[in-house]
Curated annotation (Swiss-Prot):
GO terms for molecular function: rRNA binding; structural constituent of ribosome. It comes from Daucus carota. One of the primary rRNA binding proteins, it binds directly to 16S rRNA where it nucleates assembly of the head domain of the 30S subunit. Its main location: plastid. Part of the 30S ribosomal subunit. This is Small ribosomal subunit protein uS7cz/uS7cy. GO terms for cellular component: chloroplast; small ribosomal subunit.
Length: 155
């Protein structure tokens, strides 16, 4: 039996300008080689572009995009009797948001375009409208989970 106590769950900090945890999560995921100031620049430029494109509150567009891409269920590889099955599992809200952010950034990196801020803003606007690569990834994950529903008892 372990003598160590359980670790406290860390809460995500909020960013300096918008005081929003989602923006901070996005910054931490877009971060490369420790260049956090560049990550903040990219995010804030993307938010400005969203403001120009939609003429609505950019944070509500961001929230709507992340809510639209967040998966409810995913598949996890589980080895049972020599064969690997894709077992559908439910996803918690924090893990779902993290996955959604990862998918949004991956989809925006794939996009053709000038710079990351432009590509990210385009992907976020598309995701808020219900289209784009990140939404397609979510639907594909849900389809995989539905197809492998028979293996749900392997959890």
């Amino acid at each position: 039996m372990s003598r160590r106590g359980t670790a406290e769950e860390k809460t995500a900090k909020s960013d300096p300008i918008y005081r929003n945890r989602l923006v901070n999560m996005l910054v931490n995921r877009i971060l490369k080689h420790g260049k956090k100031s560049l990550a903040y620049q990219i995010i804030y430029r993307a938010v400005k572009k969203i403001q120009q494109k939609t003429e609505t509150n950019p944070l509500s567009v961001l929230r709507q995009a992340i809510r639209g891409v967040t998966p409810d269920i995913a598949v996890k590889a589980r080895r049972v009797g020599g064969s690997t099955h894709q077992v559908p599992i439910e996803i918690g809200s924090t893990q779902g948001k993290a996955l959604a952010i990862r998918w949004l950034l991956a989809a925006s990196r794939k996009r053709p375009g000038r710079n990351m801020a432009f590509k990210l803003s385009s992907e976020l606007v598309d995701a808020a409208k219900g289209s784009g690569d990140a939404i397609r990834k979510k639907e594909e994950t849900h389809r995989m989970a539905e197809a492998n529903r028979a293996f749900a008892h392997f959890r």
